[in-house]
Amino acid sequence: MYVFGIFAVMIAVGALIGAVTNHFAIKMLFRPYKAIYIFGKRVPFTPGLIPKRRDELARQMGQMVTGHLLTTEGLKKRLASDAVKSQAVQVGERLLARLSQSTATVEEALESIGISNPAQKADRAVSRLADEKLTAFLEAYENEPLKKLFPLEAQEKLKEKIPMVSSYILSRAVSYFESDEGKERLGHMIDDFLKERGMLGSMVQMFLGNSSLVDRVQPEIVKFLKNGETAGLLQDLLENEWDKLKEYTFKEADDKWNLKPLIFDLKEKLLKRFSLQPFFEKTIGSSISSFEQDIALRLPQMADRLLEEAGRRLDQALKQLELEQIVKEQVDNFPVERLEEMVLSISKREFKMITYLGGLLGGIIGAVQAIFVILI
């Protein structure tokens, strides 16, 4: 009976110590949540293991997530998968269908996301860009001959038009001098000419008469203008002037004819003529409807390119996101109480088995101790 009592007591005490020790060891993983101080001295094993190592745990989890879970290679492989491509195409199709039925104007859509007066801003941006490009272009070619500003093909075509221009000038001149207005103008010119000649002019005018002189000069002028040699002379003159003009540098031409204001004025007129305002006044649906089918056919190709570009920029994007720092901050801010609750709810059965195992080992150790006590 004595021996049985010793065994029972030693086993019970050992089992109790083992079970309680393991139970407290499990609890001390999380508790106490904060360090406890007595007389300014921190009590050992406070705070619990996880609260004490929270910073290190957060850092290690951040490194684990970025180094082993959300890796660039894994994300790239996911982006390149057929499932993601299919989802991207489906999203594009839904977006295209919604936009094609939209009755909002482009301007209204942009204003709804905070962009006010988009048409005016777009026109100003285009004008500013055109000014910058045009100014840079003119400065770069300021000391170059004009022929370098135009393609050789354009120069040849312009030269081919010279006979036509010459013929047009002469035909207009003939029409003018044959008209009453031209005849009257010619009469005034003859009067002015004779007045400048003084007495000689008065004598000629007295003998011939002004109207008689005009009637004689007008046919001769018309005859001269219709003469083939006159056409050839004018054509040669225009070709010579064109060849000289091509050799002018832009700076020389600008100094002579003040070209820059003309060029920029032409630019302003062209921009006003082709203002972007009508585009912004159109509905999104009408803007898309004309090429909706083309977009739908190209959606798979567009999705592939978009995902490929996303994959190329993934490294930089992940660095800018600083996922490791985000995970660390989230772990730092996660309540220890909630973490304890989660771990215990998941591993409650296992923790109980650890407690029971501690009791079993403690009981075995107690039995061994009882044997030694009896033998001694």
From Swiss-Prot:
<dbReference type="InterPro" id="IPR007383">
    <property type="entry name" value="DUF445"/>
</dbReference>
<keyword id="KW-1003">Cell membrane</keyword>
<comment type="similarity">
    <text>Belongs to the UPF0754 family.</text>
</comment>
<feature type="transmembrane region" description="Helical">
    <location>
        <begin position="356"/>
        <end position="376"/>
    </location>
</feature>
<dbReference type="GO" id="GO:0005886">
    <property type="term" value="C:plasma membrane"/>
</dbReference>
<dbReference type="Pfam" id="PF04286">
    <property type="entry name" value="DUF445"/>
</dbReference>
<keyword id="KW-0812">Transmembrane</keyword>
<keyword id="KW-1133">Transmembrane helix</keyword>
<dbReference type="InterPro" id="IPR016991">
    <property type="entry name" value="UCP032178"/>
</dbReference>
<protein>
    <recommendedName>
        <fullName>UPF0754 membrane protein BLi01057/BL02871</fullName>
    </recommendedName>
</protein>
<keyword id="KW-0472">Membrane</keyword>
<feature type="transmembrane region" description="Helical">
    <location>
        <begin position="1"/>
        <end position="21"/>
    </location>
</feature>
